[in-house]
A protein has these predicted regions:
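Lipid interaction determinants
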Residues: 1-80, 87-142
């Protein structure tokens, strides 16, 4: 596999937690999109479905005009980051340049990649007990 195989926009179909014993438990529904560009950049935005709207922000994209409580509520469960990507064997490495969680900046997220036509699966490395999560994506427009 190579970088060009991932280029495009992908929408999440679903995610699941896989236990070390092989049992699978679906995770909460999410609204997610990941993009890979031909020149090696990527970004992902992942939010819980059904988030409540905040008070009007006068057309602003940020939440600076909302209350601290509204900002906190809007941010719960949000994962968003961007940076560079590189396919290495059966893995894709996301080198994080900017992120909602500032602790992730400078990290590299490794995901095992499975690609079948317009369907993509990204799996996190297993923890010490063999548990991991995976996200299923479909190429946008397919």
């Amino acid at each position: 596999m190579q970088n060009s195989d991932l280029v495009g926009v992908w929408r999440e179909l679903g995610r699941e937690n896989v236990a070390g014993d092989g049992s699978i438990k679906p995770d909460v529904p999410r609204a997610s999109q990941i993009m890979y560009t031909p020149d090696g950049y990527m970004s992902v935005v992942n939010t819980p479905k059904g988030r409540k709207p905040v008070n009007e922000t006068a057309g602003r994209m940020d939440l600076d005009a909302t209350s601290p409580a509204e900002r906190a509520q809007a941010a719960i469960g949000v994962v968003a980051y961007a940076g560079r990507f590189e396919v290495k064997g059966e893995e894709v490495h996301h080198m994080i340049f900017t992120a909602v969680n500032p602790n992730r900046v400078g990290e590299t997220q490794r995901r095992r990649v499975t690609l079948s036509g317009d369907d993509l699966t990204l799996s996190a490395p297993p923890d010490a007990q063999g548990n991991f999560f995976r996200i299923h994506w479909r190429r946008a427009g397919k």
